[in-house]
Design a protein with these regions (language model features):
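Amphipathic alpha-helical interface segments
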Residues: 1-99, 125-179
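Histidine-centered, metal-coordinating catalytic motifs and their short helical/loop contexts
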Residues: 97-121
């Protein structure tokens, strides 16, 4: 049986979210992101049906893992909009960023691949040139790409710590929060 925190979501789009609804949305999106992180990590450590024809499936799964990790972080940021949660979650985000300093660069390059593919002046990371976009390695644990390294086990642990920070807010949320 699945357990969910009981907060009524507001249905009118013209009203700002209550604190309880903001925490609920953050928590819901973080749970989704954690599932995606675990899914991508599992796929990276297993054989998949398409592997025989698509030998770079691991590359795509790593790119999806990067997106899921950044989405987890962005989902946690929602909780910082609630004053009673701001400090604990902001500290957890700071720790997440310290544990995964390469994540933003990897996400930026992956998300703005069109700029990097042509060495556009709009690139945030000028050290990343078009020739390095499809050059990297993965040893089953560590992904090396664009001069950065991402250990998928360390990334999962950092994700769990961030998720646990928001979970502590959810667990301590007043039951009669008026929502």
């Amino acid at each position: 049986m699945k357990k969910y925190i009981s907060v009524k979501l507001q249905t009118r789009n013209n009203q700002p979210l209550s604190d309880a609804a903001m925490i609920e949305r953050s928590w819901s999106l973080m749970n989704e992101s954690m599932r995606a992180i675990d899914l991508q990590r599992r796929r990276l450590r297993s054989g998949e049906p398409e592997d025989a024809e698509f030998v770079f499936r691991w590359w795509v799964d790593l790119q999806f893992l990067i997106v899921a990790l950044r989405r987890l972080r962005r989902s946690a940021e929602l909780a910082t909009r609630v004053s009673t949660a701001k400090s604990i979650v902001a500290d957890a985000i700071k720790q997440f960023d310290q544990e995964l300093p390469m994540l933003q660069k990897m996400r930026n390059v992956g998300e703005h691949i069109d700029d990097y593919a042509v060495d556009s002046e709009k690139r945030r990371h000028k050290d990343v040139e078009r020739f390095s976009l499809q050059v990297g390695s993965f040893d089953g644990t560590t992904y090396e790409w664009i001069g950065a390294r991402l250990n998928i086990d360390e990334a999962r642990l950092a994700s769990i710590h961030l998720w646990e920070a928001v979970r502590s807010v959810v667990k301590n949320w007043p039951k009669d929060s008026g929502n």
